[in-house]
Amino acid sequence: MNEDIEYIKTIDYTKSKLNIIANEISSAMNVTIKFEPIKEAQLGYYNYSGGEHKIFVDNSMSVEKQLSVLLHELGHRILHNRENELDKSQARREAEAESFAYVVGQQFGIDTPSGEYILPYIQGTDVKLKDIFEDVFKAVKNFNDKVQMKPMITSFIKYDNDIDNMKKL
């Protein structure tokens, strides 16, 4: 498994690949995804209104950072729907979303700074990592059941290898 992750890390994430990923996620997870400038001091946010799920990501960051933020906000979309939103503290919701981003990011070969964020969210609270991880792993399974990542990643690797081979000519 670790060899697969190291191999995936060779993917050169570009804006076009980010758009392919976003389109796949948007379709599979029933969420509108927008990359645009965000004036507030946040990198992205998830919004549910009028029966529509929306994720906004600040497009002024690197492509890998945008993907990381997209995955964090997608964690909110999957884990924090209207029914269970009030049952969880803000700290727990943020820790869950960041944990989701970390696990799925690893599948994409993206290093997320999740470790820096997860523990501070829950320090000084009664939130237990075990409880967070149970919910996160269910959410990751839900994501993996709906989003066809393997063909997408395989095509990215093939494309990058083809480009590398063309450069050698």
Regions found by a protein language model. Name each.
Residues 51-70, 85-92:
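Short pre-active-site segment immediately N-terminal to the catalytic Zn-binding motif
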Residues 68-82, 97:
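Active-site recognition of the HExxH zinc-binding catalytic motif
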Residues 97, 164-169:
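Non-Sec secretion/translocation targeting segments of pathogen effectors
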Residues 1-55, 61:
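Contiguous, non-catalytic segments that form substrate-binding/exosite surfaces or channel walls
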Residues 26-31, 37-42, 50-53, 70, ...:
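Catalytic phosphate/metal-binding cores of nucleic-acid and nucleotide-processing enzymes, i.e., regions
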Residues 102-166:
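Long, well-structured alpha-helical subdomains associated
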